[in-house]
Amino acid sequence: MRNRGHLVLPVLIVMICVVSGCAITPTPKVQQPMSVRPPDLPVIPPSQTSGGIYQAVFDYQGRGRYIPLFEDRRARSIGDTIIVALNEKTNASKKTGSNAQRAGEIGLSVPSFLGLPFKSIFQDLDLEATSSNKFDGKGESSSNNNFTGTIAVTVLDILPNGNLLVSGEKQIGINQGHEFIRLSGVINPINIINNTVSSIQVADARIEYRGNGYLDEVQTMGWLSRFFLSISPF
């Protein structure tokens, strides 16, 4: 008995350590890269100089870049950045109900069963059975989400029709944790005004807002708890 008592404490410590490590942070929904390196541009020959109408534009490495004269500065190439104004507001509600009821009854008098003379044997024995089933179920759910802010995204690719595949991330450190805002989607260049576009105009948008501090870990259910919850019949 004493040997078993000495084993209880180590076993409890191991179980506590295992259960404490059961919480797993969910994987991000935005899986593609958050940024990309712009492609190398050809160097403009020294003989190509600015004139009265045409203006040759150079970057910090001396590489030439074409900018139309009568168009505003907006993202149009891989590696360019766009400001996305987050303005998401969704409301959803659902209410369901069902009702089912069934009843049955059966009676049997043995002396008259099939017209056979069983009266003297069973002494007027009667059989009777009844059954009744009733089911009533109701369900109701509602959701209300509101998300506002801004985030800068990077053009990852240009689709054949000219649309821009973008993705970006913003990290904010608050006290002992960090908040992550991730966004990816497809933007039509026509909707870009002053290099800004609304999130409601982003196609195939994936917006994710999460944290990695202790508050996020507390709100995450461990895999062992989810396992017992999935097999529980109650």
Swiss-Prot record:
Lipid positions (S-diacylglycerol cysteine): C17
Sorted UniProt keywords: Bacterial flagellum, Cell outer membrane, Lipoprotein, Membrane, Palmitate, Signal
Signal peptide as annotated in the record: 1-16
Superkingdom assignment: Bacteria
Lipid attachment site numbers (N-palmitoyl cysteine): C17
Membrane topology according to the record: Lipid-anchor
One GO CC annotation: bacterial-type flagellum basal body, distal rod, L ring
Ranges that cross the membrane: none
Gene Ontology MF term list: cytoskeletal motor activity
Cellular compartments annotated: Cell outer membrane; Bacterial flagellum basal body
Coarse class of the protein's main subcellular location: membrane
GO terms (BP aspect): bacterial-type flagellum-dependent cell motility
HAMAP family: FlgH (MF_00415)
Family recorded in the similarity comment: Belongs to the FlgH family.
Subunit structure and binding partners: The basal body constitutes a major portion of the flagellar organelle and consists of four rings (L,P,S, and M) mounted on a central rod.
Function: Assembles around the rod to form the L-ring and probably protects the motor/basal body from shearing forces during rotation.
Protein name as it appears in the record: Flagellar L-ring protein
Organism: Nitrosomonas europaea (strain ATCC 19718 / CIP 103999 / KCTC 2705 / NBRC 14298)
Species lineage: Bacteria, Pseudomonadati, Pseudomonadota, Betaproteobacteria, Nitrosomonadales
Gene: flgH
